[in-house]
């Protein structure tokens, strides 16, 4: 299935039914009076978060959604039937934006979340409401109100605990295959991952979390180069960022880069930090661990020396790991440490919740 994380739709609520002008007509009752019923309310349009969906691809084929109009009122004080609501299922993590005002009107973060995006019109009043001492036979009724109409932009931000980021071909997809049941496409060329992949990592029988493999970023991602802004926003909800670097990207004796992703390890770190800061400085405040991958492409001692030199040059103080995603060596300790971090984050959040009461 193609991954689609943006869509624009039009939602149209149903108009209210018109009120009825009618008079009671029965034998032996010459002056029955008005008995026109009210029109039914128009149906509304709702968005509902559905955990079974993970893409907005369906909205590429259907963009206009209409709720039913309310039925007109009838004689004998019969009210019109209300129009049926229109329910639109969206993936968890969908942000809803009013295109006309550019206002965020909703954020669907839990399964079953409901959001009213277009309210149906109220049904019109029948003529029975307009009877008075001076107007015993009103021929007046009100039409139903118009339903709301909006154009909405839907943006999907993946709900993942861990977001993996790095330049193309550093081994993110291989890593997610190593630690989860996900099977993203893997090959030895850049941009293998064209859409974000999600994997579930199970630590114990009842302990698991979600990891997102975001497509490789390139310079200018914050400006939209290579669909960068679409991919970067998937990192905003994560609790931890794993910054993957190809440690095998070295230079020859003349200083020419000859293997790896085309950037030296220190450049991979610094250039990506620039993109994160330009897109959303808050991303740099998230816990971010360095994962130095492809250690299997050189002797173990050389890989360790390169890693320690890089950490020293970066003045890196956060956790870092030297791994081989292909052989899975060193990958599991990262996952265990991540689970420990998440448990600590939950404890802190619980304490803050209690203290704020």
Curated annotation (Swiss-Prot):
Top-level lineage group: Bacteria
Keyword annotations of the record: Cytoplasm, GTP-binding, Hydrolase, Magnesium, Metal-binding, Nucleotide-binding
SUPFAM superfamilies, A to Z: Obg GTP-binding protein N-terminal domain, P-loop containing nucleoside triphosphate hydrolases
Subcellular location: Cytoplasm
Sequence positions that bind Mg(2+): 173, 193
Any Gene Ontology biological process: ribosome biogenesis
Family recorded in the similarity comment: Belongs to the TRAFAC class OBG-HflX-like GTPase superfamily. OBG GTPase family.
PANTHER family named among the record's database cross-references: DEVELOPMENTALLY REGULATED GTP-BINDING PROTEIN-RELATED, MITOCHONDRIAL RIBOSOME-ASSOCIATED GTPASE 2
Protein name: GTPase Obg
Species in which this protein is naturally found: Xylella fastidiosa (strain M12)
Gene: obg
């Amino acid at each position: 299935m193609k991954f689609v994380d943006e869509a624009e739709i039009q939602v149209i609520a149903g108009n209210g039914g018109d009120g009825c002008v009618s008079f009671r007509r029965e034998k032996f009752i010459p002056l029955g009076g008005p008995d026109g019923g009210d029109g039914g309310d128009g149906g509304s349009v709702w968005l509902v978060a559905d955990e079974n969906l993970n893409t907005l691809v369906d909205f590429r084929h259907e963009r206009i959604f209409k709720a039913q109009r309310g039925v007109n009122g009838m004689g004998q004080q019969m009210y019109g039937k209300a129009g049926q609501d229109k329910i639109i299922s969206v993936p968890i993590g969908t942000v809803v934006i009013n295109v006309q005002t550019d206002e965020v009107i909703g954020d669907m973060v839990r399964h079953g979340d409901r959001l009213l995006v277009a309210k149906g019109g109220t049904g019109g009043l029948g003529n029975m409401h307009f009877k008075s001492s001076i107007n015993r036979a009103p021929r007046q009724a009100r039409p139903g109100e118009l339903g709301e109409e909006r154009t909405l932009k839907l943006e999907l931000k993946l709900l993942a605990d861990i977001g993996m980021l790095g330049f193309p071909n550093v081994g993110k997809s291989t890593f997610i295959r190593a630690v989860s049941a996900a099977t993203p496409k893997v090959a030895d060329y850049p941009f293998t991952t064209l859409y974000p992949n999600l994997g579930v990592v199970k630590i114990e029988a009842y302990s698991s979390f979600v990891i997102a493999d975001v497509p490789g970023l390139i310079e200018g991602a914050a400006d939209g180069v290579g669909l960068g802004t679409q991919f970067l926003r998937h990192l905003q909800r994560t609790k931890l960022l794993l910054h993957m670097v190809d440690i095998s990207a070295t230079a020859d004796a003349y200083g020419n880069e000859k293997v790896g992703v085309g950037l030296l390890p220190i450049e991979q770190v610094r250039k990506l930090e620039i993109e994160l800061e330009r897109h959303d400085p808050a991303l740099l405040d998230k816990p971010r661990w360095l994962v130095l991958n492809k250690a299997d492409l050189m002797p173990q001692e050389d890989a360790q020396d390169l890693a320690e030199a890089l950490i020293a040059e970066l003045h890196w103080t956060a956790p870092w790991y030297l791994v081989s995603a292909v052989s899975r060596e060193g990958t599991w300790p990262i996952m265990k440490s991540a689970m420990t971090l998440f448990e600590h984050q939950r404890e802190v959040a619980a304490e803050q919740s209690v203290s704020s009461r």
